[in-house]
């Protein structure tokens, strides 16, 4: 038996087949002490790293027709390497998605030497609350559904990566969100897709996003440091991203 705890006259023990109980100290003989160690090997997450500076722009696409503006949008930029069109919304808490992704859009961008990382969001269409994001991400099966559909859509239109823009993550949802990023990163690696994750500017009230862990499992961690003023700000300032 293995001694689990010692008391004044009794010892709590566990047998080899897992049965736990108590025996008197005097009933135990041939006591032997052993140091038990367990080798922990941290999982190695491979990553994709570009050999150039990423200059990424989000393209706010709200309908299929808006995809036709890709040529104009690229022409208005200089030094652009990556477009992140807002194509994907999480439709419901079961993990289904709605998509306006376009293979023609991707094909044109590639001809201009611009990569496409399609953006998936938990707001502005479909689910759009902390409660709904928690209901989605706190279930393994729902995360799996979401990831499966994201990968399938990415491969269908030929994008180079997936950009995650989840802005409705509560404190209690943080651990489930990070598990989602871990699981998605594995599937992205298996399919040669870049994984980038968008974040608020780091503050004490958004530590649940766990940027340190993101940095281990994702390819790129993005800080949305817009030089703009929010709606309702007491001060006047720029509002354009």
Regions found by a protein language model. Give the residues of each.
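Active-site groove signature of glycoside hydrolases
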Residues: 87, 145-176, 217-235
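Substrate-binding surface in catalytic domains of secreted glycosidases
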Residues: 93-97, 174-241
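Substrate-binding cleft and catalytic face of glycoside hydrolase catalytic domains
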Residues: 84-85, 104-141, 150-157, 161, ...
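Boundary regions of SH3-family modules and the immediately adjacent low-complexity/disordered segments
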Residues: 2-5, 14-53
């Amino acid at each position: 038996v293995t001694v689990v705890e010692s008391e004044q006259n009794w010892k709590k023990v566990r047998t080899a087949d897992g049965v736990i109980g108590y025996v008197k100290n005097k009933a135990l003989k041939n006591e032997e002490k052993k140091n038990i160690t367990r080798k922990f090997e941290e999982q190695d997450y491979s990553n994709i790293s570009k050999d150039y500076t990423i200059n990424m722009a989000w393209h706010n696409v709200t309908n299929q027709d808006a995809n036709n503006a890709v040529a104009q949008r690229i022409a208005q930029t200089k030094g652009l390497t990556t477009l992140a069109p807002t194509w994907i919304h999480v439709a419901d808490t079961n993990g289904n998605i709605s998509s306006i992704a376009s293979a023609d859009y991707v094909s044109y961008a590639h001809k201009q030497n611009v990569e496409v990382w399609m953006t998936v969001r938990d707001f502005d269409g479909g689910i759009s609350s902390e409660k709904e994001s928690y209901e989605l991400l706190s279930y393994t099966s729902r995360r799996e559904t979401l990831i499966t559909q994201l990968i399938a859509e990415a491969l269908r239109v030929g994008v180079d990566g997936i950009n995650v823009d989840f802005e409705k993550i509560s404190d209690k949802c943080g651990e489930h969100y990070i598990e989602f990023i871990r699981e998605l990163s594995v599937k992205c690696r298996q399919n040669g897709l870049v994984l980038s994750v968008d974040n608020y500017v780091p503050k004490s009230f958004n530590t649940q996003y766990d940027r340190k862990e993101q940095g281990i499992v994702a390819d790129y961690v993005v800080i949305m440091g817009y030089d703009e003023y929010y709606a309702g700000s007491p001060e006047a300032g720029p509002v354009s991203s």
